């Protein structure tokens, strides 16, 4: 039986305090999940629970919660996440640190890349908006994000932070990510279709490939260095 791909962590700085628990394959969460996360999950904020997934997000930024909820849902993750941040300054530290913490947890939970597909891509629409995402579990952190957002903010999240969130996740998770919104008139739709496309691409990339158990998907023979 394969080991669970999960991780729980706390990331504390003078600017933010992030707690999260992640299971890449959904289902149950790690046994060391912080009790406060389980309590927060009962609040119903940006959350849903089923036998296959448990999701609850509360960063203090509603639109960021919405994007991370969509990302976790369509990636097939179970994810509990809370953040107490210095929102009296602005949204930058909270949005950035949450995505760094999520990337750190993802990298820890994934462990070895042996046996996975490594590459994933997806197109996802939301009404008139269409986005494309391509992911490589490469251990070579890089991101190109072109969403063409025109508004200053969506809800309480600065539009300049939306690509920065994806870049922060890519850096911490050590993924190569390309995401672009091909068309769309509504910035909410453009952003959400991008997060959904990224989620489906990640889900494909980390999927196990039958018959390639233990095989590293690289001509180098390793994705660790």
Swiss-Prot record:
Enzyme class label: lyase
Keyword DNA damage: no
Domain of life: Eukaryota
SUPFAM superfamilies hit by this protein: Ribosomal protein S5 domain 2-like
Pathway(s) annotated for this protein in UniProt: Amino-acid biosynthesis; L-histidine biosynthesis; L-histidine from 5-phospho-alpha-D-ribose 1-diphosphate: step 6/9
Alphabetical GO biological process terms: L-histidine biosynthetic process
Its EC number(s): 4.2.1.19
CDD domains referenced in this protein's UniProt entry, alphabetically: IGPD (cd07914)
Any Pfam family matching the protein: IGPD
Key words, A-Z: Amino-acid biosynthesis, Histidine biosynthesis, Lyase
Recorded GO MF terms: imidazoleglycerol-phosphate dehydratase activity
InterPro entries recorded: IGPD_sf (IPR038494), ImidazoleglycerolP_deHydtase (IPR000807), ImidazoleglycerP_deHydtase_CS (IPR020565), Ribosomal_Su5_D2-typ_SF (IPR020568)
Catalyzed reaction equations: D-erythro-1-(imidazol-4-yl)glycerol 3-phosphate = 3-(imidazol-4-yl)-2-oxopropyl phosphate + H2O
Family: Belongs to the imidazoleglycerol-phosphate dehydratase family.
Protein's name in the database: Imidazoleglycerol-phosphate dehydratase
């Amino acid at each position: 039986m394969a080991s669970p791909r999960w991780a729980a962590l706390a990331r504390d700085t003078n600017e933010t305090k992030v707690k999260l628990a992640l299971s890449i394959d959904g289902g149950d969460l790690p046994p060391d999940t912080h009790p406060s996360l389980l309590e927060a999950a009962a609040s119903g904020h940006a959350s849903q629970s089923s036998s296959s997934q448990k999701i609850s997000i509360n960063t203090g930024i509603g639109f960021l919660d919405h994007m991370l909820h969509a990302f976790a849902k369509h990636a097939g993750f179970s994810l509990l996440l809370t953040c107490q941040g210095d929102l009296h300054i602005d949204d930058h530290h909270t949005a950035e640190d949450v995505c760094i913490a999520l990337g750190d947890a993802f990298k820890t939970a994934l462990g070895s890349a042996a046996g996975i597909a490594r590459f994933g891509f997806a197109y996802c629409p939301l009404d008139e908006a269409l986005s494309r995402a391509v992911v490589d579990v490469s251990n070579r952190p890089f991101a190109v994000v072109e969403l063409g957002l025109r508004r200053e903010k969506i809800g309480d999240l600065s539009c300049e932070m939306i690509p920065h969130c994806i870049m922060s996740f890519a850096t911490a998770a050590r993924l190569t990510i390309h995401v672009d919104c091909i068309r769309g008139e509504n910035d909410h739709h453009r952003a959400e279709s991008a997060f959904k496309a990224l989620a489906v691409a990640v889900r494909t990339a980390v999927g196990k490939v039958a018959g390639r158990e233990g095989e590293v998907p690289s001509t180098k023979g390793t994705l660790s260095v």
